[in-house]
């Protein structure tokens, strides 16, 4: 419609212009010069404001505009590097107008091109958030920050603890690489969130699908890469301060980074970073959740040195958190659970408080890492990384010991200390004939776990060794990739059985492989296909659990004869990207044989707290198939609509049934209006979005106390902009409202869905002050 | 230049060595110690006016899991009699066994025993003790039987720290057992 009107107007304009040519013989001509030097300026634009006519100055700085009708005109002369100049004219005949332009102080910002080394398989979909998209997630925990990716959801224990789920797989089936080191915490528990401060990262990436060859055991569902920015070698001091406030939980987060080089010490760079977080009780639309506060203190230090081909980096980080566990989720027996479910809302009511009482967990995670690499002149590259992690988890039960003198000590009821030493050596061979590049690597891991308190999982020593080889062939539009790996793992467990120390040895070994192809049909259109295998040895909780899981009101029993899980993953994707429209369609089919899960047993088990449903760790064969679709279309000027769809179907093929705890399908739509750039502020936007999560209808019958919660739809709005405070200082402001209409809902993958609703409306204000180069 | 490289390699090697201070998890196995485990619950019925005491127990010496409960007695009482009912809780996984009853008595303002017969006509329970806040406890009380019949007696210990209000609702179960009750 608009277009027709436009063409019509254009025609009229052309006709009237034509009609007037006979009388319009006026002209303007002149010379454009630099005010200071007096030199002619070549290539400056001289145009008539409000009309579509303009000319460039020639090699002598001359210009001439002809065939003008008599009348008043505004002439503008401009060129980059000079202030534009306007002049009003009353034309009756020919006129000469010379311009003397004043040089403008324009400093174009340096353009920096950085390349990132990502070891992820190139034929697998890799999604990344960084920059302002990542900024929008600031203040949230790692899993929440990743929820924007299609195919990524989260497994929650209330609102403060969440862990990422990729294509329906989580915990030990997802590998998290924190700054190049595999994160080793007590990942087996669903209430054990990854101990990583997202403020460390300037890039968060997700490799969807099995990536067992490059990363070894556990990367069945995918890999999450948490990567900091390259250290600022030989740069002046810079930094940023982030402050985020949330109304729900009255949570405040403050994080700062300072970095730079050292004068007189060439090739050196350093960075210091710290985060503080404090939040109180979370509120659902109707009530507060008692004891859901959080307090977090993290910091990291990094330094590095670069000289020619040599690079050395050292990194230290400490993550320290204290999380309250919703006291209404504490149950002693099945009767307690059923009465909470029947009540429909928690029995324990509270107001707002920052206080964190029992039950709670205090977790600290310490990482120290040293990495060195050397680029040889001939193109070979060698990299060696060593790291030590200490994960210290303390869980405090609701009930203190009845014995007063013991209670006064306030000891945690459960303590795990997990120490991990990793060692990775990677050799990138020099490209052969400019087309074949590859790497050969060896990684080892030594780990020991010490536990104290309520019997849950045993102490253990674990040793892993993996050897891998990958090659990539690139030729006109094609990229082919192949790799293989061998892993060997020993595990020795130590338990007390009838007051005797019992140790048990396990040995696991496995081959994995990957084969992939990428075809770039054009600059805009590409396709990828990857077949990958991965494996995962059963972890100690699956081997040795034996007791009531109070949070789940279930008696869980491990099985020491479990065999490793093996996954075969096929993933294909098509991608189209043009300036106005981008779309990515991915499909995957993941077969996991000997998939370990908790199988409900026919007979309940009797304890002093009553009869509990009895679940045993069992193996089956499962298939995970799904579709991820994301598309974004700038359908009108400045206005973009984005849609993301995740669809997943999981089936237990051995028992001909569905599997429990699989995220439901969802669609996320956003419409965003970006304001045109202004001299003072830029990147200003306003967006409104909706997330629709379907009900999970594919669950095995009689497998749960409660049917999966119904579907829900949440609205959110966001707005933000960036101001240039000065040449080297920027202030970014963002406001967002999640769950705009304060809807009561429960998510199937929130373990507290039995007890309470999910979080209500949450307004957040985000400020980011960036300074320095 | 050569020098810095040498130094850096040495540093890195030194770091690698310091990383290898391994420890063995097997040297440090602690005896599992579950706080306040209850492995045995004994109900002692003493017929009024006599010294005849009969005890009925639930025993699971190794706690949850492991071996199944070794004992879960059927309560046998006479019709139309009045009994004094006392309860005893023990943790027999420790040597010597620790007496949880004493600890419950010490923190009586956080605990409540609930005795629920089904059908309710089998037995009537009356509390015989009160805590500092004048709420009943149930460590001792009276049980009155009526006509003969068979059913269950549900015995619960509600743990209600800070929330005890005289009703069973707040808190969570520390004990929840369904004894078979025969009045004959």
List each model region and its residues.
Chain B
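Short beta-strand segments enriched for Tyr within beta-sheet-rich domains
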Residues: 81-85
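N-terminal edge beta-strand
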Residues: 50-78
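Short acidic/polar inter-strand loop motif in beta-rich domains
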Residues: 50-52, 91-99, 160-166
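Bacterial Sec-dependent N-terminal signal peptides
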Residues: 17-43
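Sec-dependent bacterial lipoprotein signal peptides
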Residues: 1-21
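Extended low-complexity, serine/threonine- and proline-enriched intrinsically disordered segments
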Residues: 39-45, 104-119
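Helix-rich interaction surfaces within compact, conserved domain-sized segments
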Residues: 115-184
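Short, solvent-exposed beta-strand/turn "edge" segments of beta-rich domains on protein surfaces
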Residues: 31-34, 72-79, 170
């Amino acid at each position: 419609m608009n277009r027709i009107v436009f063409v019509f107007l254009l025609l009229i304009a052309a006709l009237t212009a034509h009609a007037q040519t006979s009388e319009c013989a006026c002209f303007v001509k002149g010379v454009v010069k630099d005010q200071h030097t007096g030199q002619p300026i070549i290539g400056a634009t001289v145009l008539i404001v409000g009309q579509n006519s303009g000319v460039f100055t020639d090699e002598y700085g001359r210009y001439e505009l002809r065939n003008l009708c008599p009348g008043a005109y505004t002439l503008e002369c401009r060129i980059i590097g000079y202030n534009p100049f306007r002049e009003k004219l009353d034309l009756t005949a020919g006129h000469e107008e010379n311009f003397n332009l004043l040089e403008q102080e324009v400093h174009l910002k340096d353009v920096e091109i950085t390349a990132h080394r990502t070891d992820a398989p190139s034929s697998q979909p890799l999604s990344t958030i960084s920059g302002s998209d990542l900024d929008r997630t600031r203040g949230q925990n790692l899993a929440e920050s990743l929820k924007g990716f299609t195919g990524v959801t989260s497994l929650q224990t209330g609102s403060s603890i969440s862990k990422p789920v990729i294509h329906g797989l989580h915990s030990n089936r997802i590998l998290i690489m924190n700054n190049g080191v595999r994160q080793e915490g007590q990942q087996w528990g669903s209430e054990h969130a990854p101990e990583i401060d997202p403020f460390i990262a300037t890039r968060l990436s997700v490799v969807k699908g099995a990536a067992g060859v490059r990363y070894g055991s556990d990367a069945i569902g995918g890999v999450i890469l948490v990567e900091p920015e390259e250290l600022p070698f030989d740069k002046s001091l810079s930094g940023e301060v982030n402050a985020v406030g949330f109304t729900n939980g009255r949570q405040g987060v403050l994080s700062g980074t300072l970095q730079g080089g050292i004068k007189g010490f060439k090739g050196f760079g350093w960075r210091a970073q710290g985060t503080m977080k404090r939040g109180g009780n979370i509120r659902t639309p109707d009530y507060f959740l008692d004891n859901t506060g959080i307090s977090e203190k993290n910091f990291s230090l990094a330094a590095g040195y670069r000289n020619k081909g040599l690079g050395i980096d050292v990194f230290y980080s400490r993550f320290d958190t204290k999380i309250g566990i919703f006291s209404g989720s504490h149950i002693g027996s099945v009767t307690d659970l059923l009465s909470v479910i029947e009540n429909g809302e928690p029995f324990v009511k509270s107001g707002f408080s920052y206080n964190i009482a029992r039950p709670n967990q205090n977790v600290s995670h310490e990482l120290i890492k040293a990495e060195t690499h050397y680029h040889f002149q001939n193109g070979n590259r060698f990299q060696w990384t060593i790291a030590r992690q200490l994960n210290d988890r303390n869980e405090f039960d609701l009930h203190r010991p009845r014995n007063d003198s013991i209670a006064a000590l306030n000891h945690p009821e459960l303590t795990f200390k997990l120490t991990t030493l990793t060692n990775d050596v990677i050799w990138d061979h020099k490209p052969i004939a400019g087309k074949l590049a590859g790497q050969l690597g060896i990684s080892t891991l030594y780990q020991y776990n010490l536990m104290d308190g309520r019997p849950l999982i045993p102490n253990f020593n674990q040793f892993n060794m993996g050897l891998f080889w990958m090659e990539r062939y690139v030729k006109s539009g094609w990229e082919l990739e192949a790799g293989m790996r061998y892993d060997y793992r020993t595990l020795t467990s130590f338990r007390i059985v009838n007051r005797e120390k019992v140790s048990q040895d396990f040995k696991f070994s496995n081959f994995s492989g990957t084969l992939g192809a990428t075809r770039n049909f054009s600059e805009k259109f590409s396709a990828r296909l990857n077949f990958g295998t991965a494996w995962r040895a059963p972890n100690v909780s699956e081997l040795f659990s034996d007791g009531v899981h109070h949070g789940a009101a279930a008696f869980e029993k491990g099985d020491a004869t479990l065999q490793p899980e093996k996954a075969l993953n096929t993933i294909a994707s098509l991608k189209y990207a043009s300036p106005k429209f981008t779309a990515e369609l991915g499909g995957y089919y993941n077969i996991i044989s000997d998939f370990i899960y908790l199988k409900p047993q026919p007979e309940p088990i009797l304890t002093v707290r009553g009869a509990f449903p009895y679940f045993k760790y069992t193996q089956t064969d499962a298939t995970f198939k799904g579709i991820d679709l994301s598309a974004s279309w700038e359908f009108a000027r400045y206005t973009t609509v984005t849609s993301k769809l995740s669809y997943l179907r999981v089936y237990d093929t051995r028992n001909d049934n569905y599997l429990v705890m699989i995220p439901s399908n969802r669609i996320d739509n956003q419409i965003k209006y970006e304001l045109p750039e202004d001299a003072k502020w830029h990147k200003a936007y306003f967006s409104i979005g909706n997330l629709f999560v379907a009900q999970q209808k594919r669950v095995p019958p009689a497998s749960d106390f409660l049917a999966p919660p119904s579907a829900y739809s949440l609205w959110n709005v966001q707005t933000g902009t960036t101001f240039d405070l000065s040449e080297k200082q920027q202030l970014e402001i963002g406001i967002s409202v999640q769950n705009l209409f304060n809807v009561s809902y429960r998510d199937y993958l929130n373990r507290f869905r039995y007890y309470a609703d999910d979080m209500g409306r949450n307004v957040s204000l985000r400020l980011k002050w960036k300074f320095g180069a | 230049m050569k020098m810095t490289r040498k130094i850096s390699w040495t540093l890195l090697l030194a770091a690698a060595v310091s990383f290898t201070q391994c420890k063995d998890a097997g040297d440090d196995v602690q005896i599992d110690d579950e706080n306040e485990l209850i492995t045995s619950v004994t109900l002692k019925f003493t017929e009024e006016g006599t010294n005849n005491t009969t005890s009925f127990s639930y025993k699971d010496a190794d706690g949850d899991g492991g071996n199944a409960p070794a004992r879960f007695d059927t309560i046998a009482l006479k019709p139309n009699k009045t009994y004094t009912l006392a309860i005893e809780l023990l943790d027999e996984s420790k040597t010597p066994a620790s007496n949880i009853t004493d600890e419950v008595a010490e923190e009586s303002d956080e605990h409540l025993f609930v005795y629920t017969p089904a059908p309710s006509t089998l037995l009537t329970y009356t509390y015989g003790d009160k805590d500092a806040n004048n709420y009943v406890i149930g460590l001792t009380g009276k049980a009155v039987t009526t006509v003969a019949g068979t059913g269950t007696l549900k015995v619960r210990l509600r743990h209600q720290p800070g929330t005890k209000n005289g009703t069973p609702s707040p808190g969570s179960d520390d004990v929840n057992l369904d004894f078979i009750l025969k009045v004959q």
